[in-house]
UniProtKB/Swiss-Prot annotation:
Functional summary from the UniProt entry: Hydrolyzes the pyrophosphate bond of UDP-2,3-diacylglucosamine to yield 2,3-diacylglucosamine 1-phosphate (lipid X) and UMP by catalyzing the attack of water at the alpha-P atom. Involved in the biosynthesis of lipid A, a phosphorylated glycolipid that anchors the lipopolysaccharide to the outer membrane of the cell.
Lineage: Bacteria, Pseudomonadati, Pseudomonadota, Gammaproteobacteria, Enterobacterales
Localization of this protein: Cell inner membrane
InterPro entries tied to this protein: Calcineurin-like_PHP_ApaH (IPR004843), LpxH-like (IPR043461), Metallo-depent_PP-like (IPR029052), UDP-diacylglucosamine_Hdrlase (IPR010138)
EC numbers for this chain: 3.6.1.54
Biological processes per GO annotation: lipid A biosynthetic process
Cysteines paired by S-S bonds: none
Positions annotated to bind Mn(2+) 1: D8, H10, D41, H197
Gene name of this polypeptide: lpxH
Binding site for substrate: N79, R80, D122, S160, N164, K167, H195
Organism: Salmonella dublin (strain CT_02021853)
Catalytic activity line of the entry: UDP-2-N,3-O-bis[(3R)-3-hydroxytetradecanoyl]-alpha-D-glucosamine + H2O = 2-N,3-O-bis[(3R)-3-hydroxytetradecanoyl]-alpha-D-glucosaminyl 1-phosphate + UMP + 2 H(+)
Sequence positions that bind Mn(2+) 2: D41, N79, H114, H195
GO MF annotation terms: manganese ion binding; UDP-2,3-diacylglucosamine hydrolase activity
Protein name, as recorded: UDP-2,3-diacylglucosamine hydrolase
PANTHER family: UDP-2,3-DIACYLGLUCOSAMINE HYDROLASE, UDP-2,3-DIACYLGLUCOSAMINE HYDROLASE-RELATED
């Protein structure tokens, strides 16, 4: 019995080794799990479910194959793929979840999320996030021709990279008070998230009790997953 969590794969055709590693993960580890949760940034960018990129179809088919053998797959949007919609969910068999979700995992209540909403010290990013998550802005963007959407997405990624290069690492990490507030709001002692690309298990106090924040790593030269069993919560790095 095990439930698996992954995040921040940033899949793109320019990184075939990561794509191949994820396909192997789906073919082996994922099929042995009780469930698979993908906590955002599965793709490096997403400009709409109507994008004919062959990689998207390949990944959808591979996830659907896992679902078809009886392993449910769930998805929380990240900051790179927040426009993944019902069409891709249907093609992949994934169940779309809200940005925060509490799970009962073998007797533990665990809060899961992508993690960008915890980085409240980065006021510039939070303001940008509020704009692009406006439903009207998203609807307008999705009405644009694909070639224009690609240009806008490329420009936004370049702008984000430039902005992040001038920010301190502390600003781009989670805010400790925000973490505690979220865990106490949901009355949990466990939090699993991604986004920061800083894999670790942090001990803290929430609800006047010991608590744990487990941060998934990004997939680069190795993969990263959290494996939750009735007896343990493990952060695992593995070769791709």
């Amino acid at each position: 019995m095990a439930t698996l969590f992954i995040a921040d794969l940033h899949l793109q055709t320019e990184e075939p080794a990561i794509v191949a590693g994820f396909l192997r993960f789906l073919a082996v580890e994922a099929r042995q799990a009780d469930a698979l949760y993908i906590l955002g940034d599965l793709f490096e960018a997403w400009i709409g479910d109507d994008d004919p990129n062959p990689l998207h179809r390949e990944i959808a088919a591979a996830i659907k194959a896992v679902v078809n053998v009886g392993v449910p797959c769930f998805f929380i949007h990240g900051n790179r793929d927040f426009l993944i919609g019902k069409r891709f969910a249907r093609e992949s068999g994934m169940i779309l979840l809200p940005q925060e979700k509490v799970l009962d995992l073998y007797g533990r209540n665990v809060l899961i999320m992508h993690g960008d909403t915890l980085c409240t010290d980065d006021a510039g990013y939070q303001a940008f996030r509020a704009k692009v998550h406006n439903p009207w802005v998203q609807r307008l963007f999705l009405t644009l021709p694909l070639f224009i959407r690609r240009r806008i997405a490329a420009r936004m990624r370049a702008g984000s990279k430039a902005a992040n290069s001038s920010k301190s690492l502390d600003i781009m990490d989670v805010n400790a008070q925000t973490v505690v507030a979220e865990m106490e709001k949901h009355r949990v002692q466990w939090l699993i998230h991604g986004h920061t690309h800083r894999p670790a298990v942090h001990e803290l106090s929430a609800n006047d009790q010991p608590a744990f924040r487990v941060v998934l790593g990004a997939w680069h030269h190795e993969g990263s997953m959290v494996k939750v069993t009735p007896d343990n919560v493990e952060l695992i790095a593995f070769p791709l």
